[in-house]
């Protein structure tokens, strides 16, 4: 019986070869699908680095002459002062934990700002979080030293920026990485003595752009820069 079975297999070796080839192709395709699904789910379930539970977004624009409450002659300084008044009133409500201003950098935002600075001669490029200090408390960012979001809010100043700890990891030629960045004073935009310089005042855990962005992707590396009144005024004029 075994001899007849082996003989039959040998006689049908050509058709069996095609069958094995088909099975191999199906196996490769299934393996690829499983691998893609596994990697996608693994990335999806990684820590986001922020928390949006019970957060709300308010968007403001300047009134045009077509608005019923439009007041001609108002200056940008007055509009920015009114914006701060809205923020202060919201922040003093007992059911509100924190309120911040930001420009084009809330979680899951469709757009983003870019930023660059130099570590010695190495240009480092990342996303830009253009924010006021309370932003860290609103979205509960985490300081790498374990001190929480309050310390990050205190660290962000017009002369001091806050970075994600992994911001320079993809730049192998950079002289400093990770915790070594803390306290460095670096030129931004241009590597020249007269360029604006900012201090690296604090580092946060990696913050992902969305659920499908890995922690080492461009969208998960950022620099948080103080959103000044002057910047708000210039944004309102554009």
Which residues make up each language-model segment?
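A short amphipathic helical element positioned immediately N-terminal to and/or at the very start
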Residues: 2-10, 86
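Membrane-embedded glycan transfer/ligation machinery
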Residues: 3, 18, 51-53, 129
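Alpha-helical scaffold elements within enzyme catalytic domains, especially in hydrolases
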Residues: 8, 89-90, 135, 180
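Membrane-helix entry/capping segments
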Residues: 11-12, 238
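Short, strongly hydrophobic transmembrane alpha-helices
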Residues: 12-42, 50
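Membrane-proximal extracellular/periplasmic loop immediately following the first transmembrane helix
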Residues: 37-123
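Mid-to-C-terminal secondary-structure elements
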Residues: 104-238
């Amino acid at each position: 019986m075994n001899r007849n079975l082996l003989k039959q297999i040998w006689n049908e070796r050509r058709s069996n070869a095609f069958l094995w080839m088909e099975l191999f192709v199906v196996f490769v395709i299934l393996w690829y699908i499983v691998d893609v699904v596994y990697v996608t789910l693994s990335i999806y379930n990684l820590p986001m680095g922020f928390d949006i539970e019970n957060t709300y977004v308010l968007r403001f624009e300047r009134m045009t002459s077509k608005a019923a409450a439009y007041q001609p002659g108002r200056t940008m300084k007055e509009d920015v002062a009114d914006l701060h008044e809205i923020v202060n009133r919201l922040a003093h409500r007992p059911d509100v934990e924190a309120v911040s201003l930001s420009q084009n950098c809330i979680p899951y935002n469709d757009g983003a700002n870019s930023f660059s600075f130099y570590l010695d001669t190495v240009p480092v490029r990342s996303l830009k979080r253009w924010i006021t200090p309370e932003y860290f408390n609103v979205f509960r960012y985490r300081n790498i030293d374990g001190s929480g979001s309050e310390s990050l809010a205190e660290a962000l100043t017009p002369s001091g920026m806050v970075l994600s700890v992994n911001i320079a990891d993809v730049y192998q030629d950079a002289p400093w990485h990770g915790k070594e960045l803390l306290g460095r004073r670096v030129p931004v935009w241009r590597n020249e003595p007269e360029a604006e310089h900012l201090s690296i005042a604090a580092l946060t855990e990696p913050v992902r752009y969305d659920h499908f962005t890995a922690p080492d992707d461009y969208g998960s590396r950022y620099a948080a820069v103080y959103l000044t009144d002057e910047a708000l005024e210039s944004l309102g004029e554009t």
